[in-house]
Amino acid sequence: MKFQEGVFLVVIFFLAYTQLVKGQHQPREDCKLKCGNVTIEYPFGISTGCYYPGDDNFNLTCVVEEKLLLFGIIQVTNISHSGHVSVLFERFSECYEQKNETNGTALGYQLGSSFSLSSNNKFTLVGCNALSLLSTFGKQNYSTGCLSLCNSQPEANGRCNGVGCCTTEDFSVPFDSDTFQFGSVRLRNQVNNSLDLFNTSVYQFNPCTYAFLVEDGKFNFDSSKDLKNLRNVTRFPVALDWSIGNQTCEQAGSTRICGKNSSCYNSTTRNGYICKCNEGYDGNPYRSEGCKDIDECISDTHNCSDPKTCRNRDGGFDCKCPSGYDLNSSMSCTRPEYKRTRIFLVIIIGVLVLLLAAICIQHATKQRKYTKLRRQFFEQNGGGMLIQRLSGAGLSNIDFKIFTEEGMKEATNGYDESRILGQGGQGTVYKGILPDNTIVAIKKARLADSRQVDQFIHEVLVLSQINHRNVVKILGCCLETEVPLLVYEFITNGTLFDHLHGSIFDSSLTWEHRLRIAIEVAGTLAYLHSSASIPIIHRDIKTANILLDENLTAKVADFGASKLIPMDKEQLTTMVQGTLGYLDPEYYTTGLLNEKSDVYSFGVVLMELLSGQKALCFERPQASKHLVSYFVSATEENRLHEIIDDQVLNEDNLKEIQEAARIAAECTRLMGEERPRMKEVAAKLEALRVEKTKHKWSDQYPEENEHLIGGHILSAQGETSSSIGYDSIKNVAILDIETGR
């Protein structure tokens, strides 16, 4: 009796020990499962307790650039728990000057004891008159290579057949080889030991030879590109085989780490074993519960003729027929003949009843579905968020209307293409006519993803908080559609871009018009930066976002990229967004956004107003593609007359244009801290207009001008003054800006 109890205790202890050993091989629950785009599968891991503890070769490194490294140097691109891992190996290259040779050193790798080269690789040489060699070292050394010959540019046929490119057809390294090296050499003349074969014509199209390992099917030779510089590719994908330990399945015995519903297989390329899920299971076989049952009935991997007869079971499936049916040899369920007629009648009656019921409830169901869909779109498009933010910002009482989907369709004639006013990065703008014949502009977002929805809600909130005569007025929005719609006032005269560069308008903007437009835009930006309840940076100021009404009054539009700056901050770090040609270079390189970014963009707009040329034009010469550099260079070299638009330049306004050009140059200085604030820019431009008006008035009434300006004005202290200072004009302009509209 005592003997039997002892045997029982030994068995219990053995089972408990076995489970304990297996449990110690399982990773922690908090292990990192991804590095960049690579999923990390156990037994691999990137920290203690996350990889197989019996072998440090499975300890990977995730560097700052989100790259996964093997042995700390080899980048991993994919891990498969079937015993394969994809990595990137460097190429070997050796370049030659004409008639001279540059000696290179073979490139070598030493893999860990758990890894070896897969036979699913090719050893490839690209070059003319060269020989490549790959050698592996282990219990049995192995070498392979190939020869490539050519004295002229090979035909571009995509073949790697020994002319400009060669590859090993049978790549099978010896068992348990984990160290290898490879390289290439140029063929020499056996008579004088020179590189005569490498003549001038070959040097022109093949200055270098390249030897590299690459996974089969991952490289296609192109003689027109690869012989020159291998398309600048320096690393190639290579397949490695891996296994657990250095024992066979039988030798490892109960210490194997194969989980439940998996089997152990001896490695075919080196010592050790791998685990695979049993048939009917899928998952990671190295986890204790990693192999999960595959539901063949759902995954459609069964052979039952009717999916309804499929019944899933653990590790497989069965085809079972319902009561009254028999399973035939083709795995189909059939019913005896005498029962078919009765079933047919029952089916017909049932179908008629269902059709009648469907007709009765169709209308109600359709209405319910339509209402639910509109409600779903409303929430999906941020309706709840918009109402909450409008209320939280104290904007619930503004004249802001929520439009219906039907109203938007009628207003745009079903979103007819003829109603499209313009298209941009944030969406499409349609011309709409409301039931009261009010003409509006309707902006339809391009995509209905979360980022676009946030930008849409952001634009609504920004526009709702701006009350300025030179900012496009928001009227409302529609959130019942798949993509959100924004409704704002319709500006009849197109954009400033159309008037300066487009063919839609036969426009001839005078200097007075252009100066006034510049003053209005500058004043608007100064208001947004300094006088709005929360400072706002537009972030996309350009002529295409400045609308003109019938009186050529400027209206700043498209606030989809704008940013609200907290009162306690002067700048924000954001993802760079804007339009090339107008984008602040300092913001582009640092990601730091502040009001000086709008100042730069406005400076480009002012240059367009002065020159009549586009901010970025690839049709201009290389030195003048970017208007800013072209304009600043002309200003500094006293060549301003070459770039100023002929429609605005004359002797009467030359000084004004020179001053405006100087302001534009100041706005586009490379360093943001050297640019003026928008308030200062607006004041300077306003001073230009005041000075222009003063000169015009003095020319018309010279006697009065002499009396007021040339004479003396009595001061409060009894002294006299004979001039009106620029600072006084500037102060008046600043006061006008800060007051707002």
Curated annotation (Swiss-Prot):
**Reactions this protein catalyses:** L-seryl-[protein] + ATP = O-phospho-L-seryl-[protein] + ADP + H(+); L-threonyl-[protein] + ATP = O-phospho-L-threonyl-[protein] + ADP + H(+)
Q: Where are its TM segments located? A: 343-363
Tissue specificity here reads: Predominantly expressed in green tissues such as stems and leaves.
Record's GO cellular component terms: membrane
Protein kinase domain: from which residue to which, for each copy? 415-698
Q: Name one GO molecular function term.
A: polysaccharide binding
Which compartment or compartments is the protein found in? Membrane
| InterPro entries from the UniProt entry | EGF-like_Ca-bd_dom (IPR001881), EGF-like_dom (IPR000742), EGF-type_Asp/Asn_hydroxyl_site (IPR000152), EGF_Ca-bd_CS (IPR018097), Kinase-like_dom_sf (IPR011009), NOTCH1_EGF-like (IPR049883), Prot_kinase_dom (IPR000719), Ser-Thr/Tyr_kinase_cat_dom (IPR001245)
Q: Which PROSITE patterns match?
A: ASX_HYDROXYL, EGF_2, EGF_3, EGF_CA, PROTEIN_KINASE_DOM, PROTEIN_KINASE_ST
Q: Name one Pfam family in it.
A: GUB_WAK_bind
In this entry, the parts of the chain located on the Extracellular side of the membrane are 24-342
Q: Where is the EGF-like domain?
A: 245-292, 293-334
List of catalytic residues: 540
Question: Can you say what this protein is called?
Answer: Wall-associated receptor kinase 3
Source species = Arabidopsis thaliana
